[in-house]
């Protein structure tokens, strides 16, 4: 099946990476809204739902471990210092455009059809980009097993909107849904700093529109 041009630009499929397995520390853990045409974020609001999406089920599985998020955050900070800072990690993992500025990176999980994947969500002045903490096994076109990092890269100009959702039965379970102009959606959950991540993404989108 041929992917649309937008989909090709949005998704960076897993690619072999020379980084060591587990470039980040093991984590101690780990609805929809009409998109306004005038602004991507001016009308953002939360929508609660009783139905369980794949993302909700994923976070149910993660729930018991979320009590250790403080330890997880401290471990991440130590590892980032060891690697030389977020900028170096970001440039090592993704292609950086001219004048692109990295704002922040947040530990979270990306929901996939195969389950949730722990990693870092980078937010910059040009895109959001996710990379799994650990490499995963995939089969190459030649039929060989290889280990790769799972990556997703979405240019800000291809984001149609960002929605906040939460589980009505478990309000502490909160999600960010990123919807592209081609109507593909990406669910992020299990944030150590959920509101800070949303505010940072909102700021990036606002600045991109200016």
Curated annotation (Swiss-Prot):
Pfam families according to UniProt: GRAM
Domain of life: Eukaryota
Family membership noted in the UniProt record: Belongs to the GEM family.
Signal peptide: none
Protein name: GEM-like protein 7
InterPro entries: GEM-like, GRAM, PH-like_dom_sf
Segments forming domain GRAM: 88-166
Family matches, as SMART domains: GRAM
């Amino acid at each position: 099946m041929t992917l649309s041009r937008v989909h090709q630009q949005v998704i960076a499929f897993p690619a072999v990476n020379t980084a060591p397995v587990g470039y980040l520390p093991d984590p101690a853990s780990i609805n929809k809204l009409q998109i306004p045409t005038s602004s991507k974020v001016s009308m953002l609001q939360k929508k609660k739902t009783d139905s369980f999406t794949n993302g909700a089920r994923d976070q149910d599985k993660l729930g018991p471990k979320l009590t250790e998020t403080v330890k997880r955050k401290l471990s991440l900070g130590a590892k980032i210092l060891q690697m030389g800072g977020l900028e170096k990690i970001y440039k090592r993992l993704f292609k950086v455009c001219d004048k692109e500025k990295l704002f922040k990176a947040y530990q979270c999980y990306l929901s996939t059809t195969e389950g949730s994947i722990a990693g870092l969500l980078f937010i910059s002045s040009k895109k959001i980009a996710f990379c799994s903490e650990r490499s995963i096994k995939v089969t190459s076109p030649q039929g060989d097993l290889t280990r790769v990092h799972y990556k997703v890269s979405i240019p800000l100009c291809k984001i149609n909107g960002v929605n906040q959702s939460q589980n009505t039965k478990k309000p502490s379970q909160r999600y960010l849904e990123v919807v592209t102009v081609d109507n593909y959606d990406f669910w992020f959950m299990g944030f150590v700093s959920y509101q800070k991540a949303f505010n940072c993404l909102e700021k990036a989108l606002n600045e991109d529109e200016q």
